[in-house]
Amino acid sequence: MGMSNRSVSTSIFFLALVVLHGIQDTEERHLKTTSLEIEGIYKKTEAEHPSIVVTYTRRGVLQKEVIAHPTDFRPTNPGNSPGVGHSNGRH
């Protein structure tokens, strides 16, 4: 009787593990593309428009990324943070 209970418990555990693993895969966060993925796109040997020449350097992508969003992590003044779900302090 004890061995049967153990095998049922083990089976239920592995079944739950498989089901929960599927849920975890659907709840993941999409991250930004890395410069290595972008580098692969630009290094294609075929060009859509052969008259246009595109040069790509990894340093250029990193510099654009820094300059593109300079105010992303700007602190707010004390007392002026709207909080979650509020666009202003008049609620």
From Swiss-Prot:
Q: Any chance you could tell me the propeptide residue ranges? A: 29-71, 87-91
Q: Give the signal sequence positions.
A: 1-28
List the transmembrane segments.
Answer: none
- Residue list for modification Hydroxyproline: P75, P78, P82
Q: Which residues form a coiled coil?
A: none
What keywords were assigned to this record? Apoplast, Developmental protein, Hormone, Hydroxylation, Secreted, Signal
UniProt function note: Extracellular signaling peptide that represses, in a dose-dependent manner, primary root growth rate and lateral root elongation by inhibiting both cell division in meristems and cell growth in elongation zones. Also slightly prevents growth of above-ground parts. Regulates systemic nitrogen (N)-demand signaling. Mediates systemic up-regulation of genes involved in N uptake and assimilation pathways (e.g. NRT1.1, NRT2.1 and NRT3.1).
Please give the name of this protein. Answer: Precursor of CEP1
| Organism expressing this protein natively | Arabidopsis thaliana (Mouse-ear cress)
